[in-house]
Amino acid sequence: MNYTKFDVKNWVRREHFEFYRHRLPCGFSLTSKIDITTLKKSLDDSAYKFYPVMIYLIAQAVNQFDELRMAIKDDELIVWDSVDPQFTVFHQETETFSALSCPYSSDIDQFMVNYLSVMERYKSDTKLFPQGVTPENHLNISALPWVNFDSFNLNVANFTDYFAPIITMAKYQQEGDRLLLPLSVQVHHAVCDGFHVARFINRLQELCNSKLK
């Protein structure tokens, strides 16, 4: 879990950071529809399943932007060298979910090895956090594959210094000749503005339009 201390003093967003961290601590969410038409077609001849592929692509996009890898450590702002996805797994028998994490790798084959290893070990464990303590360097990914939504928001009480992005996918649906996936991104306003979330979403769309390798 390597990281770099961030130079807040000379940051162009210093005023924004301090205002939304101390004077008006808040977050916001933004929902957009990701076109997954090309991605789904490419998976027809692949051994990879859609959900872990989306976890991989989301993690890949998040890891390209400093503002999505920021955290407070020892009361200082830092940027993790990389963040690992923490994702939800639904248990049909109990109608509950667990949150699992696996090491991120930019190589999709290695990432899938990591993902499958975690799933094989913990997929039947119904505790909320089967692996115990969540890694400090993480992002959050979950899915609601039962419903298509236009917006999604987590109402967080007593908003504090939790800067990890929270990304939620809905049920995808056909619209004309396109397959669209609603995706909600929730962030802390101290480290992210609408511009940064839009940049992440646009990058994720580019990744979904590209070949996996």
From Swiss-Prot:
Which residues are named in the active-site annotation?
H189
- Per its UniProt record, what SMART domains does this chain match? CAT
**UniProt KW Transferase keyword:** yes
Q: Which reaction does it catalyse?
A: chloramphenicol + acetyl-CoA = chloramphenicol 3-acetate + CoA
Keywords (alphabetical) are: Acyltransferase, Antibiotic resistance, Plasmid, Transferase
InterPro entries the UniProt entry points to: CAT-like_dom_sf, Chloramphenicol_AcTrfase_AS, Cmp_AcTrfase
Annotated GO biological process: response to antibiotic
Q: Name one Pfam family in it.
A: CAT
Q: Which family does it belong to?
A: Belongs to the chloramphenicol acetyltransferase family.
Note the subunit structure.
Homotrimer.
- Supply the NCBIfam families for this chain: chloram_CatA
Q: What does this protein do?
A: This enzyme is an effector of chloramphenicol resistance in bacteria.
Put simply, this protein is called Chloramphenicol acetyltransferase 3
Q: Which organism is it from?
A: Escherichia coli
State which gene encodes it: cat3
